[in-house]
From Swiss-Prot:
SUPFAM superfamilies: FKBP-like (SSF54534), GreA transcript cleavage protein, N-terminal domain (SSF46557). This is Transcription elongation factor GreA. Gene3D superfamilies: Transcription elongation factor, GreA/GreB, C-terminal domain, Transcription elongation factor, GreA/GreB, N-terminal domain. The lineage of its organism: Bacteria, Pseudomonadati, Pseudomonadota, Alphaproteobacteria, Hyphomicrobiales. Belongs to the GreA/GreB family. It comes from Rhodopseudomonas palustris (strain BisB18). It holds the Pfam family GreA_GreB_N.
């Protein structure tokens, strides 16, 4: 059975943009670099050629990965979600029970997770601890850095 990849419409669009960039801009540029390096003669000691081939391999691998994720995408329209129970797409405000620090996280699909932008993967330890909980609940998260306790102070749909 093909496993679906949950993501927001914005996450899907970002993957499409990256795929198009890699196919229509990066791929031709890399092919040009390979041709240019090839014209310099002996390929066995041609570092420029080997670097371009490695870049091509990396780019083609990422293209295949993007095509796979887009083909398996399960786009979830967050604007149609509501309620006070945390699930995919929720934006959750937490207070660290030890430090009293506030943190805001949106639960998104794996391909669009970016901690710097406040977006955590639905498969992360924190998201797994939050799913199904409501405002006012306390959760304990066991992560590689140790156990942390949080209080859920707000659940939003943005």
């Amino acid at each position: 059975m093909i496993e679906k990849v949950p993501m927001t419409a914005g996450g899907y669009a970002a993957l499409e943009v990256e795929l198009k960039q890699r196919q229509s801009v990066d791929r031709p540029r890399i092919i040009e670099h390979i041709a240019e390096a090839r014209s310099h003669g002996d390929l066995s000691e041609n570092a420029e050629y080997h670097a371009a081939k490695e870049e091509q391999s990396h780019n083609e691998g990422r293209i295949a990965e993007l095509e796979d994720k887009l083909a398996r995408a399960d786009i979830i329209d967050i604007s149609k979600l509501s309620g006070d129970t945390i699930k995919f797409g929720a934006t959750v405000t937490l207070i660290d029970e030890d430090t009293e620090k506030k943190a805001v996280w949106q639960i998104v699909g794996e391909p669009e997770a970016d901690a710097k932008k406040g977006r955590i993967s639905i498969t992360s330890p924190l998201a797994r601890a939050l799913i199904g909980k409501k405002k006012g609940a306390s959760v304990e998260v066991v992560a590689p850095g140790g156990a942390k306790a949080y209080e859920i102070t707000k659940v939003e749909w943005r």
